[in-house]
Amino acid sequence: MRHPGSPILEVLGLAYGYNGETLQHDVSFDVKRGSIFAIMGASGSGKSTLLKVLIGLQRPSAGEIAFGGVSYCSLDDPERAEIGRHFGVLFQGGALWSSMTAAENVALPLQMFTELDRPSIEALVQLKLTLVGLDTGRDRMPSDLSGGMRQRVGLARALALDPEILFLDEPSTGLDPISARHFDDLVKGLRDGFGVTVIMVSHELPSLFGICDDGVFLDAEARTAIAHGAPHILRDECTHPTVQAFMHRGSIAGPSQSRGCS
């Protein structure tokens, strides 16, 4: 039986980088089922690269990642792809195919990874678009959509196969404050309503403080994780200067109580 709050993803001693250069090493954390988990850190700390490692687009140089208790870093490509079927991913900007309509973008994973007939796929596409608040615009091209609408289409596509974990890479980038807040509310509603676990790369303080209930903080200089916990707890209780500088960018952070890092 799967219990809410039990670990759905476990990361132990992870190291990764590019072209022989290590971005991060000895990174460990657990993601609880049903949580909204933040990957935090300044620019260049390896947040988006960590996401690529977690979803299997890049292999780590050391360490283990386990989904539901199954370690998948050392699996061959077909076996890792099977694990990946449990993941939905929204890359920066939505990453939509420019030559496809909104509906065609959402339909693509259903066409690729299921044997559903066309009417069933059409029904699911409409369901997913409605789920993210897009009752209209299914036949429009990405270039004709606003930034917020493109993100919603990308989110609908990420949800197409009913993932257990939803990965979001800087989902608020390029959105105005109102659109960003609406998107945050949508993500929280998906977690609350459907129990999906969310792992989100973000540097946006309103999103971090507003919807994330756990997280890990990566430091570019130390090249490892220097703090763990909910963003608002790190803001109020972590004394590490790098964490404090990140969390207190602007008045939204509020006063720190500085009681140490978890």
Regions found by a protein language model. Give the residues of each.
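The feature captures the beta-strand-to-loop junction immediately N-terminal to the Walker
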Residues: 40-42
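Catalytic Walker B motif of ABC-type/P-loop ATPase nucleotide-binding domains
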Residues: 166-169
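Conserved ABC ATPase "signature" region
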Residues: 71, 119-136
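Conserved ABC transporter NBD signature motif
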Residues: 63-71
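Conserved ABC ATPase signature
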Residues: 141-145, 149
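Helix-to-loop junction immediately C-terminal to a conserved catalytic motif
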Residues: 55
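A short, proline-enriched helix->beta-strand linker immediately N-terminal to the Walker B motif
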Residues: 160-164
